Amino acid sequence: MRIISQDGTVDVPYENVIIRVEGRTIEAYMGATYALMGVYQSTDDAIAVLREIVTYSREKYATYHMPQSNEVKNGRVQRL
């Protein structure tokens, strides 16, 4: 699975997040949450993005586009 960041580049570190998170509760893997908190406004927003990444990986989508920071509010991803 490829994950494409907001500027269109492929973010390799997020692929490691997919592997480590799959099959576990997302909240338990805080390393991924902290990495995403550098992009999004709150822990809830970071967890919302992480949930979406895991859902995409389980459903075997080939590519996941990271949402813009203004598309994640109150712990929900809302694509504009």
Report each predicted region and the residues it spans.
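Eukaryotic intrinsically disordered, low-complexity regulatory linkers and tails enriched in Ser/Thr/Pro
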Residues: 1-80
